[in-house]
């Protein structure tokens, strides 16, 4: 059974990153995809926090218009840069919902979503077309158990052990504080930005 991550790496060449989790995760992801996987990767920022961790460059752009204009902006961006995959963190944010709707109408586009891991500590979830309620994963326990058993037998080994990540609240708090401070500090540069918890599709 091929993982979503393997499918993404095999089938995507020109990738657009939207909003990631608070902090530098998407910047590290962009570097990895370019340096280790040979992908062409672009990034769109929506606020000053995004821009702080992913400064404007030849591959990083700021979207400063209203959400009503985002789909048209996205279309022009995709065509100009020949994007074949869009990646984001969480599919409930308004720009991500609009991007998914756009991808569903574009036969050659795919839409990929990171989310905090569902079941196992130290893991992050990565799915095609949606997460949580919008996930396309089967919800039947028997099929999960069968798939896990088949994978274990096929590979003749136990699942790989997890590399634990240190819980570091102070580091995460500093990253988040800086992110939200930059949103406030650069609010005049992004006058139409609204935090995803404050916005809904009409």
Model-derived segments and spans:
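Polar/charged alpha-helical tracts
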Residues: 6-10, 80, 178
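Active-site and donor-binding regions of nucleotide-sugar-utilizing enzymes
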Residues: 23-27, 46-144
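Generic detector of leucine side chains in alpha-helical contexts
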Residues: 8-9, 16-18, 29, 33, ...
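N-terminal subdomain of nucleotide-sugar transferases
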Residues: 1-47
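Active-site-proximal region of nucleotide-activated glycan assembly enzymes
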Residues: 109-201
């Amino acid at each position: 059974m091929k993982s979503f991550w393997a499918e993404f790496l095999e089938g995507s060449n020109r990738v657009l990153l939207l909003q990631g989790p608070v902090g530098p995760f998407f910047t590290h992801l962009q570097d990895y995809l370019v340096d280790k996987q040979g992908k062409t990767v672009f990034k769109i920022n929506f606020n000053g926090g995004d821009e702080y961790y992913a400064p404007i460059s030849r591959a990083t752009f700021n979207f400063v218009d209203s959400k009503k204009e985002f789909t048209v902006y996205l279309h022009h961006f995709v065509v100009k840069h020949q994007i074949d995959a869009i990646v984001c963190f969480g599919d409930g944010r308004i720009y991500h919902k609009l991007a998914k709707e756009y991808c569903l109408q574009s036969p050659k586009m795919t839409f990929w979503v990171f989310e905090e891991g569902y079941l196992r500590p130290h893991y992050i979830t990565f799915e095609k077309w949606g997460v949580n309620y919008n996930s396309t994963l089967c919800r039947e326990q028997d099929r999960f158990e069968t798939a896990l058993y088949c994978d274990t037998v096929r590979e003749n080994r136990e699942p790989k052990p997890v590399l634990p990540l240190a819980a570091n609240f102070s580091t995460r708090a500093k990253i988040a504080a800086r992110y939200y401070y930059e949103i406030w500090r650069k609010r005049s540069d992004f006058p139409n930005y609204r935090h995803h918890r404050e916005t809904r599709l009409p």
